[in-house]
Amino acid sequence: EGYGNGYNDTTLNLDHLSNFLSVYESKMILDYGCGKGDLTKYLNKSYTCYGYDPAIEEFDNEYRGIDFDTIVCLDVLEHIPEAELDALLNNIKSYNVDSLYFIVSTRYAKTKLPDGRNCHETVKPKDWWKNLFETTFSDKKVIVTEQKTKNQIRVLIHEN
């Protein structure tokens, strides 16, 4: 099952995400980089979920006063320039949540930005991303799996 309009040719396996949220008993979720809020709305059917996206005025609120237990960040990091990833991941880390769920594309998008650059600015292999996540979240367990048919990786991070 998927959600949204298939933006950048990835579809989310909602069963896997739902299982992750269930296993880690997620109640308060932040959808970091929520875009138009499709996943936020979907998750609000079963959880309390807030959407944050600095590029979308409607969702440009980091909700720092809320005690989230889980952050989901799907199809976001590949859109961030490599030089800005450390700052972004450290911002995510500063929420001090128990569990995090990322999906990251490992291929270039079909879509170009108005200036001609590819929409996916940081396209790296699984091991590169794994090292970045393990370095940033060194106090947690990091599991990275590759979904080659979708040209993406799934990253699960939780307390040791």
Task: Go through each PLM region and give its residues.
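Conserved beta-strand signature within the Rossmann-like core of class I S-adenosyl-L-methionine
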Residues: 97-107
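Hydrophobic adenine-recognition pocket in adenosine-nucleotide-binding enzymes
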Residues: 76-79
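A short acidic, helix-capping loop that chelates divalent metal ions and anchors anionic groups
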Residues: 109-116
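A conserved beta-strand element that flanks and buttresses the S-adenosyl-L-methionine
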Residues: 72
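Conserved N-terminal segment of class I S-adenosyl-L-methionine
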Residues: 1-68, 86-90, 95, 116-132, ...
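Short, glycine/serine-rich, charged loops/turns that create anion-binding
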Residues: 56, 107-109
